Structures are given as structure tokens and as C-alpha cells.
Amino acid sequence: MVLFRGLKPAFKKVNKIKTKLDLHSVRTADDLLNTKDNLKFVKAVKLLIKPSTRFNRFYLSTIRKFAEFVQNITENQCGFFSQEIGFLERGLERSSRTLALCLKYFFPEEVNFANISSKDALWIYATFTAALFLDIGKIAVKYSITLFHKK
């Protein structure tokens, strides 16, 4: 079994704050994406991206790799409306909304992205990945994650 630990923010190490050891198993992309909210966001993306071969080849593979990278790490939000939400759910929500906005404002006569040119499809994919990966640097900056085998 492969585990990862160190989901406490890195500043706790610097300030020598004692925290309990927290171990989490590394999960597969299918396992991570198989939640009600995540399935809803993936379905929203799939409905917009046509043909389905384009979705399966580009979008789904990117979503799966993103899910395996961020796992179930939570993103802490500070402020008046503070909440704890996972990087995966936040990225999927942001990217699905971005695709819907692109369709509405750049292609108002279209129902989905089936009839757009290859050049436009590339721009839409770039916009999708930018929205999905927006906060991915926070994982490297805020967290210290160690991967090890339990034996």
C-alpha cells in the first residue's frame, strides 16, 4: 500500500508546531472522481465537449491526471466565507464553469463545442486546462507531502 503524509501546511514545520502524524492512502483517479459533486462537474464538461472522442482523448485524460496529482488534499480558504474544499472539486467546478462561459460569450449560437474549428478547439482546451490548474502551485508552496511505502 502506498501512502502519503504531511497534509499540514509547511509553515507548521518552520514554527515547530507539533502535529500528529496523518497518513492518507494514494487513491486512483476513478476512486477520486466517483463522488456526487465531481461526477456532476465531469458530466457538465462532457456535455459541452463534442465529439466524445475529443472529450475522452484530451479532457478526460487531463482530469484523471489532475485528480491523481491533487488526491483528496483540501484547500483551506481564509476569510469571512472560509470553507474547506478539495483542490480536485474546486478545479473541476472552475473548469466546467469556464467552459460554459466560453460557450456563452464566444460562441453564443452554439449549444456545445461540436462545430468549432480546430484552432478554436485548441483555445478552448487551453482555457480549460488553465482553469483546472489555476491553484496547483499551492500544493508545492503550502504543503509538505512525503510518499512512502508501508511495510
Predicted features, each with a name:
Residues 18-151:
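Acidic/His-rich, divalent-metal-binding segments that scaffold phosphate/diphosphate chemistry
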Residues 1-21:
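N-terminal low-structure segments adjacent to metalloprotease catalytic domains
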